[in-house]
A protein has these predicted regions:
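Conserved AMP-binding A3 loop
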Residues: 278
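Iron-sulfur cluster-binding electron-transfer modules in prokaryotic oxidoreductases
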Residues: 12-270, 275
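Cysteine-centered iron-sulfur cluster-binding motifs in ferredoxin-type domains/subunits
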Residues: 1-10, 257
Length: 278
């Protein structure tokens, strides 16, 4: 929120990117590492899942207290990232199950007015984090965000489409944050081409479930209509699903990227419609 709060509109995030760009020029080891990651992104994500699985196995065997002590010592000695009980388990989207569910949905819609239901498709691009990381071991929620999003879309009658080669795609935020702006733009261009094809040249809406990712996508992709979850639900699913308000309190955290994009009102409207205690 730095630029929104500053009377001069100064964005310290952009300044940080410029400084990092100077510190990591092309040819530096850091830049080469970033370029390697961009070119082998699918492999890096695939390699991360076993690491998360191993950490979850260790947590299950050792328990929280012992796991915390051991990993804290490893962090102090080896400098590895600090483990916490909130670390997520590995996750991957089951494309085969999605295909079966889409076929079932397609057959169900065929019994109705095909002209009305033929357009009920959405291109869903889960963020890299939500493609790779699931829930913590002791999470009170049973379904990972991507699985829950797919189930909600299909419940609303929408066939879910993923862009081709989704494992290697990224909006570029990772590299933008490190000052590698040319690599970030290259990844954005790859994503735009894949989404353009998947949406049949903008015929179907595109949904992304992570607001910082969507913020960058909206800055670099202009040929398609891009939605975040609350906005998509309010626009397309509100009249196709029955929402029953709960008495449980709901906490709403609005990120700075959401405030910049403007769909905050949709989030508040959805929250008010689903909970009496906001």
């Amino acid at each position: 929120l730095c630029s929104m709060s500053c009377p001069m509109g100064i964005n310290t995030g952009d300044l940080t990117h410029i400084i990092r760009q100077k510190e990591l020029p092309q040819g530096s080891m850091g830049y080469k590492a970033g370029n390697f990651a961009a070119n082998h992104f699918a492999g890096i994500k695939s390699a991360l899942r076993p690491v998360l699985g191993l950490a979850n196995l260790g947590h299950s065997v050792l328990g929280t207290k012992a796991m915390s002590c051991i990993t804290k010592g490893m962090h102090n000695v080896l400098g590895i990232p600090l483990w916490t009980p909130a670390m997520p388990k590995a996750y991957s989207i089951k494309s085969s199950q999605l295909a079966i569910d889409n076929d079932t949905l397609r057959n169900k819609n065929a019994d109705k007015d095909s002209a009305a239901n033929g357009q009920l498709k959405v291109v869903y691009f889960p963020s890299c984090i939500n493609q790779t990381m699931g829930l913590p071991k002791k999470s009170p929620v049973e379904q990972a965000l991507a699985s829950k999003m797919i189930a909600l879309l299909q419940k609303g009658g929408y066939e879910v489409i993923f862009p081709e080669n989704m494992e290697k795609l990224c909006c570029g935020t990772i590299w933008e944050s490190k000052g590698m702006l040319d690599i970030a733009d290259r990844k954005s261009a790859e994503l735009e081409a894949a989404l353009w094809k998947a949406s049949e040249q903008g015929r179907y809406p595109v949904l992304c479930d992570q607001s910082p990712c969507l913020h960058r996508m909206r800055e670099t992709i202009h040929k398609m209509k891009l939605y975040e979850p609350a906005e998509f639900i309010y626009t397309f699913l509100r009249n196709r699903l029955v929402f029953t308000p709960t008495d449980r309190p709901v906490a709403v955290h609005i990120t700075c990227s959401m405030r910049k994009m403007g769909p905050v009102s949709y989030t508040h409207l959805r929250a008010h419609e689903t909970s009496q205690d906001l």
